[in-house]
């Protein structure tokens, strides 16, 4: 099982990044392969000039194509997800998320930003033809404390429980996901079916 996780924060230190890292650890503890991409790791020119021929972008596209599911984590700015994340998602082909399960995660300054996932991020994921976009998780800034020195980042207990519940739902959805049939195999099956009638 392969999951691609995408961090939408341009900052090195971000609460959405903390949740993404916790999610990666949880999935890897259950034997899931997780590959993480951060928008800040892509050359700015590749994103701003939509360089589909960039090796970084092509590598990203290939892994998304191979993935069973995605976790997309973003801070919410001015009632929407990060613009840097939008530029990265714009580099995916039209049906890039077909046959994939997606778990959105967002963080914001207050609970007032919670609807940004439903009204801003989910429509973009739907336009990319995500097979199933799960309910997702929203955390306000007071629920995530950054790591300090040797002390790891902390989540309030209610958020920790919501995150684990959502990851469990995501993991189960990945396991029950129907596998798409390769076009060549499908063609062979159709020809065989005609002969057997």
UniProtKB/Swiss-Prot annotation:
Catalytic activity: FMNH2 + NADP(+) = FMN + NADPH + 2 H(+)
Xref: SUPFAM superfamilies: Flavoproteins (SSF52218)
GO molecular function: FMN reductase (NADPH) activity; FMN reductase [NAD(P)H] activity; oxidoreductase activity, acting on NAD(P)H, quinone or similar compound as acceptor
InterPro entries in the record: Flavoprotein-like_sf, FMN_Rdtase-like_dom, NAD(P)H-dep_FMN_reductase, NADPH-dep_FMN_reduc_SsuE
E.C. designation(s): 1.5.1.38
Gene3D superfamilies attached to this UniProt entry: 3.40.50.360
GO terms, biological process: alkanesulfonate catabolic process
Alphabetically ordered keywords of this record: Flavoprotein, FMN, NADP, Oxidoreductase
EC main group: oxidoreductase
Domain of life (superkingdom): Bacteria
Summary of the function given for this chain in its UniProt record: Probably forms a two-component reduced flavin mononucleotide-dependent monooxygenase by binding to SsuD. Required for growth on aliphatic sulfonates or methionine but not arylsulfonates.
NCBIfam families, sorted: FMN_reduc_SsuE, PRK10569.1
Family indicated by similarity: Belongs to the SsuE family.
PANTHER family: FMN REDUCTASE (NADPH)
Protein name: FMN reductase (NADPH)
UniProt organism field: Pseudomonas putida (strain ATCC 47054 / DSM 6125 / CFBP 8728 / NCIMB 11950 / KT2440)
Gene name for this UniProt entry: ssuE
């Amino acid at each position: 099982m392969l999951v691609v996780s995408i961090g939408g924060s341009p900052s090195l230190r971000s609460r959405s990044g903390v949740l993404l890292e916790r999610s990666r650890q949880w999935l890897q503890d259950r034997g899931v392969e997780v590959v993480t991409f951060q928008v800040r790791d892509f050359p700015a020119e590749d994103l701003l000039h939509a360089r589909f021929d960039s090796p970084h972008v092509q590598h990203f596209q290939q892994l998304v194509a191979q993935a069973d599911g995605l976790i997309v984590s973003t801070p919410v700015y001015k009632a929407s997800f990060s613009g840097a994340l939008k530029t990265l998602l714009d580099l995916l082909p039209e049906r890039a998320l077909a046959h994939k399960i997606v778990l959105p995660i967002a963080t914001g300054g207050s609970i007032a930003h919670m609807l940004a996932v439903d009204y801003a991020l989910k429509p973009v994921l739907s336009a990319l033809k995500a097979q199933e976009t799960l309910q997702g998780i929203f955390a306000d800034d007071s629920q995530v404390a950054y790591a300090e020195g040797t002390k790891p980042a902390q989540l309030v207990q209610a958020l920790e429980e919501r995150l684990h519940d959502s990851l469990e739902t995501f993991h189960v959805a990945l396991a029950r996901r129907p596998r798409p049939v390769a076009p060549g195999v499908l063609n062979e099956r159709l020809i065989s079916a005609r002969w057997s009638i």
